Amino acid sequence: MHIDWFVLLAQLVNFLILIYLLKRFLYTRIIQAMNEREAKIAARFDEAERLKREAEEAARVYEEKNSFLQGQEEKMLNQAREVVNHRQKEWMDSAREEVDAIRRRWIETVLQEKAAFLEHLRQRTGKQVFAIARKILDDLADTAIESKMVDVLIDRIHSLDPAEREKICSALEDSEEGAIVQSAFALFPEDRQRLTDTVRDLLGKPDAVIRYQESSDLIGGIEFLASGHRIAWSISDYLEHLEQDFDRVLHEEVRQTLPKPSGESVMPSEEQRP
C-alpha cells in the first residue's frame, strides 16, 4: 500500500494545531461565556420566583383582611385571585421573554465568534501547514514546494480525458486572454516554462497564451483557469475537511453544555447554521 507521507504529515500537523488552538483560545472563552449567561438566566428566574412569592403573600394577606367582610367575601376573593393570577402571568411571561432573548443573543454571539474563529484558524493553519511542508520538502528532497505544486498540476493536466481536453482547447481558441495560472506564491521561471510547455504540448496549442498571477486567496495552492474551466490543487481542500470536523465538534460541545428549555431547540439546525 502506497503511503503519501506528505499528506499524512500535513494532516497530522493540522490535527495537532487544531487541538492546541481549541484548548488555548476557544474552549475557555466558550465556558466563561456560558457561565456568565447561565448566571444571568438564573438571576432572572430567581427574580421571577421572588415576585411570585411576593404575589402569593399579597394574596394571602388580601384574603385574610377580606375574610371578615360579609356578603362580599366571595366576590372580593375572586377579584383578588384574578389580580394575582394576572400579575403572576405577566411576570412569568416577562421573565420568559427576557430569558429567551438572552439565549438568542448568546447563540448569535457564539455563532459569530465561531465563524470568525474558524476563518482565522483556517487561514492560520493553512499558512503554517504550507510553511512546514515547504521546510520538510526543502530538508528531505531539496525541492521547493512550488515545484511540487507544479508537478501535481502537470499530473492532473496529463490525466484529463480527451473530451475535457477538447473543451479546454475550444475555450482557448475562443478566448483572447488565454489561460491563467494562479498560485499563492511566485513560481520559479523554470517551473513556469515547464508548465507552459506541458499545456501547449498536451493541448496541441503551441501558441497558447498562458499568464501567471499570484493570488492571496489561495492557501498553498495552484490552479489553471481557461474560460470557466479549472484544474487546481490546494491545501485549502484539506482544510475544508478539517473545518467541517471542527465545526461539528464545536456544535456538539455547545449543544451539550447549554441548558435546553422545554419545547425549544437550543442550537439551530444544520440548515440554519452558517
Swiss-Prot record:
Intracellular or extracellular location(s): Cell inner membrane
InterPro entries with a match to the protein in the record: Alt_ATP_synth_F0_bsu (IPR017707), ATP_synth_b/b'su_bac/chlpt (IPR002146), ATP_synthase_B_chain (IPR050059)
Transmembrane segments: 2-22
Taxonomy, superkingdom: Bacteria
A molecular function (GO) term: proton-transporting ATP synthase activity, rotational mechanism
Primary location group: membrane
CDD domains: ATP-synt_Fo_b
Any one annotated GO CC term: proton-transporting ATP synthase complex
Membrane-protein topology: Single-pass membrane protein
Keywords, ordered alphabetically: ATP synthesis, Cell inner membrane, Cell membrane, CF(0), Hydrogen ion transport, Ion transport, Membrane, Transmembrane, Transmembrane helix, Transport
Matching Pfam families: ATP-synt_B
Family membership noted in the UniProt record: Belongs to the ATPase B chain family.
Subunit structure and binding partners: F-type ATPases have 2 components, F(1) - the catalytic core - and F(0) - the membrane proton channel. F(1) has five subunits: alpha(3), beta(3), gamma(1), delta(1), epsilon(1). F(0) has three main subunits: a(1), b(2) and c(10-14). The alpha and beta chains form an alternating ring which encloses part of the gamma chain. F(1) is attached to F(0) by a central stalk formed by the gamma and epsilon chains, while a peripheral stalk is formed by the delta and b chains.
Physiological role: F(1)F(0) ATP synthase produces ATP from ADP in the presence of a proton or sodium gradient. F-type ATPases consist of two structural domains, F(1) containing the extramembraneous catalytic core and F(0) containing the membrane proton channel, linked together by a central stalk and a peripheral stalk. During catalysis, ATP synthesis in the catalytic domain of F(1) is coupled via a rotary mechanism of the central stalk subunits to proton translocation.
Protein name: ATP synthase subunit b 2
Lineage: Bacteria, Pseudomonadati, Thermodesulfobacteriota, Syntrophia, Syntrophales
